[in-house]
C-alpha cells in the first residue's frame, strides 16, 4: 500500500474499494502536461523568492523536465494508489530526485494546483476550438460565394414559405457560428486567470510572487480572491454552456442536411466519406455522421446540467464533489472539436443539386407574398391584398394550378390593379432579387453579407 501524503492523521488505511472509488487518475491523465507546466512555474517562483534555494529549484526543475520527457515517450504508468494526477507526477519526480521532491509542494495545495491545471487545459482547448470554428465559418462563406444565385424554398413550419437564395440560408448559420465564436472568445477571458498561489483556500504565509507565476504561465491576470480561485468552476460552466449552444446550432444544420439529402428533397448529396451503408439493404447510403452530431448534442447538454447540479449546493470552498468537474469538460471538448471537423468536411464535400432546389420554388405557392406585396405597392391595404391572394390560392389549389398559371383575365377579375407585369413579379428569381433590404435574401444583400463576413474572418 502506497503511503498517502495526508496519512499522518490516520491510523487505518483506505478500504480498497473506497480507494478506487475516490481515485481520479483514470480520467485526469490528460492533465499531466499541464500539471508539469504549473509545477515548473511554481518551483521557479519558489527559487526566485528565496523560499527554497536556487540549487534546490534547479534540481527540482530538472527532475520535472525528465518526468515530462518520460510522459512524452509514453513511459509514465498512472497508478490508482497515487490517487490523482498531482501525486502521480510527484511520485515520478521523487523517483528522479529523491526526498527533495517534497519541497515542490511548499506554498501550494492540490486545490490551487488542480484549478491551475484546468485553467491551462481549457485555455488550450479554447484555442483549438476557436481555430476550428473559424475554419467552419470560412467554409460556409466559401460555399455561399458559389451559391448566391442558387434558389431554394425558404421554410416556416417546414412548409414552403418564400423563395430564397441558398447562400442566404448558409449565411444564417455563419451568423450563428460567429456568435458562438464570440461567446468562446469571452470564455477565454474568464479562463485566462491564474489561481496558483491561492493554496488550500486562504493563501499562504510564504512570500510567494503570484504575478511571476502568472507571467510564467502566460495568464492574463491573477485571481484576486483565494477562496474564489479554488472553489468556483464558472469558467468550465461557461464553456459547457457555450458548447451546448454550439452543438444546438450544429444539430440544427445536421437536421437540415438530413432532410435535404433524403430522396424526397434531393437538394444535396453527402460524400461517401461521411456516409455509411446498411447490413441488410444494399441500396442504402445513410448520413450517419450528421445523425451522430445531432445525437451527440444530447451528451453535451447533459454535461452542462450535470456540473450545474454538482455546483448548486456547494459551500465555499473546496469539496470533493468538484472531482466531478472534469469528465464532462473533457467529453464536451472532445465532442465539439470532432463535430466541428466532421461538419466542415461534410459541407466542403457535399454536392448541391441546384436544379432540384430551384424547381422546388416553382411548384408551390411561395410567391403568394409577392402578389400581396404587388397589390399593396399599388395602393391596396395589405390586409385586403392578403385576403384576396388567400382566396385566389384556395381556388388554384382546387383547380390544380399555380399562381403563375392564372390567366391575366382571371387576375384582373380579382383586381383591376393587376397588370401583365405580374408574371415577372411571380418568378422565383425576381422575387429573390428584389428583397435587398438590409439582411434580406436579395442577391445584392447577400453579396454584402459575404463581404462583411470576409472582413470579420480577416481579424
UniProtKB/Swiss-Prot annotation:
Q: What class of enzyme is it?
A: lyase
The UniProt record lists the keyword Amino-acid biosynthesis: yes
Molecular function terms, GO-annotated: argininosuccinate lyase activity
Q: Where in the cell is it found?
A: Cytoplasm
Q: Which GO terms describe its cellular component?
A: cytosol
Principal localization reads cytoplasm
Q: Matching InterPro entries, A to Z? A: Arg_succ_lyase_C, Argininosuccinate_lyase, Fumarase/histidase_N, Fumarate_lyase_CS, Fumarate_lyase_fam, Fumarate_lyase_N, L-Aspartase-like
Could you tell me what reaction this enzyme catalyses?
2-(N(omega)-L-arginino)succinate = fumarate + L-arginine
Q: Does the keyword Cytoplasm apply?
A: yes
Protein name in UniProt = Argininosuccinate lyase
